[in-house]
């Protein structure tokens, strides 16, 4: 299996895309470390019940001290980190326009969706430099690539993710580290639990493939970009949007 002996750190692994990526990498041999502000017991069960290897820890990605603590623990236990997947993310819980958005909500979205990605790279990259190997995957969004309504803070954060992905990839390419991001369309995760059937149909129709994406759709792309085979790909943001960006 292509990830045998790999240690993969995945944030936002409690549910949705993070859970899907954790399951996929574990199914191909990685030992997956699932990090989330919520408990990841379900993800752990899904992985270990099918023969995979995983562990979990509760961590707030917006706290640099917690990143340092977890990375130190992981390196002391396993000796190396091969893959970092920064997947934890949120959308605003209030109106998300330039006029109506509250400052506290801006800070929350930017903190989790952008600063959390930076903190992950900041704390993990040094060990990858030492090993001269690393694969980093960040989750951006279609909202980073085109204007979508009521996503002011979210699009700012995800646009920032594409920028720091490109910048960090340039800085660390000579160290054997690749850094890429995926820009999903609308993915059927618990974040959509409260939408109406009408909204679900509207989101589905926006994709050329005419359905919502699934965490598995993103996980397949994530697995390739974090694999040894993707050694000549870095600094890129890849849409995984069912053709939405072509319309």
Give residue ranges: language-model regions:
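Conserved glycine-rich cofactor-binding loop
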Residues: 14-15
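Conserved glycine-rich Rossmann-like NAD(P)H-binding loop of the short-chain dehydrogenase/reductase
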Residues: 28-42
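Short C-terminal tail/terminal secondary-structure segment
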Residues: 95, 146, 206, 223, ...
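Active-site helix of classical SDR
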Residues: 121, 157, 165
């Amino acid at each position: 299996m292509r990830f045998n002996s790999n240690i993969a750190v995945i944030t936002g692994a409690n549910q949705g895309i993070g859970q899907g990526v954790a399951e996929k990498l574990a199914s191909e041999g990685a030992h997956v470390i699932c990090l989330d502000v919520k408990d990841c017991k379900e993800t752990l069960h899904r992985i270990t019940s099918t023969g995979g290897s995983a562990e979990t820890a509760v961590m707030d990605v917006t706290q640099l001290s917690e990143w340092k603590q977890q990375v130190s623990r992981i390196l002391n236990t396993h000796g190396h980190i091969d893959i970092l997947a920064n997947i934890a993310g949120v959308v605003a819980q209030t109106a998300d326009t330039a006029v109506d958005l509250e400052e506290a909500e801006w800070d929350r979205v930017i903190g989790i969706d952008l600063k959390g990605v930076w903190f992950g790279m900041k704390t993990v990259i040094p060990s990858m430099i030492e090993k001269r190997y690393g694969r980093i995957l960040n989750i951006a969004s279609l909202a980073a690539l085109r204007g979508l309504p009521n996503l002011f803070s979210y699009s700012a954060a995800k646009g920032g993710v594409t920028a720091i992905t490109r910048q960090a990839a340039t800085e660390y390419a000579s160290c054997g580290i690749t850094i890429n991001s995926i820009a999903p369309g609308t993915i059927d995760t618990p974040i959509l639990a409260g939408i109406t059937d009408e909204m679900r149909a509207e989101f589905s129709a926006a994709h050329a493939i005419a359905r919502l994406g699934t965490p598995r759709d993103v996980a397949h792309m994530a697995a390739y970009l974090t694999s040894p085979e993707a050694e000549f790909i870095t600094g890129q943001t890849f849409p995984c949007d069912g053709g939405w960006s072509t319309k």
